[in-house]
Amino acid sequence: MAFDKDAFLTALDSMSVMELNDLVKAIEEKFGVSAAAMAAPAAGGGAAAGGAAAEEKTEFNVVLAEAGSNKVAVIKAVREITGLGLKEAKDLVDGAPKNVKEGIAKADAEAAVKKLVEAGAKAELK
C-alpha cells in the first residue's frame, strides 16, 4: 500500500494532536530514532564544539557589578539602556550585582557597559 505525498499530508491534516503524538511515538519505535535527537543537529548547523563556542560569543549579558558613588546618573543610564521605569531601574541598581541586559549583540553590550561606566558604575560584559 503506497501513499502519495498529497494523500499522506491530507491524512496527517485530519489527525488530532493525540493521534499525531501516537504517530511520532510509533515512528520512533519502528525506526529507532528520537524526535529530540533529530532537533539537536539542526540547531548546531553541523559544526562541532567550535560552532558551539562561536555561538556562545554572539550573545552577551551586561552586568551591573556596583552602582558607585553617583547612583542617580547610574539609574538614568539603566533607564536609557533598558527602558525601565524609575522604580524598576532604582531597584535594579540597589540590588547590584544584577544583569542589566541579557542575550544582546556584542556591540550593543559594549555600548551599554560604556554608558554605565561613564555614569560612575562598575559594569561587566559576560
Swiss-Prot record:
Family from the record: Belongs to the bacterial ribosomal protein bL12 family.
Keyword Ribonucleoprotein in annotation: yes
GO terms under cellular component: cytosolic large ribosomal subunit
Name of the molecule in the record: Large ribosomal subunit protein bL12
GO biological processes: translation
InterPro entries cross-referenced by the UniProt entry: Ribosomal_bL12, Ribosomal_bL12_C, Ribosomal_bL12_C/ClpS-like, Ribosomal_bL12_oligo, Ribosomal_bL12_oligo_N_sf
Gene that specifies this protein: rplL
Subunit comment: Homodimer. Part of the ribosomal stalk of the 50S ribosomal subunit. Forms a multimeric L10(L12)X complex, where L10 forms an elongated spine to which 2 to 4 L12 dimers bind in a sequential fashion. Binds GTP-bound translation factors.
Keyword hit for RNA-binding: no
Function, as annotated: Forms part of the ribosomal stalk which helps the ribosome interact with GTP-bound translation factors. Is thus essential for accurate translation.
Top-rank taxon, per record: Bacteria
Organism: Paracidovorax citrulli (strain AAC00-1) (Acidovorax citrulli)
Keywords, sorted A to Z: Ribonucleoprotein, Ribosomal protein
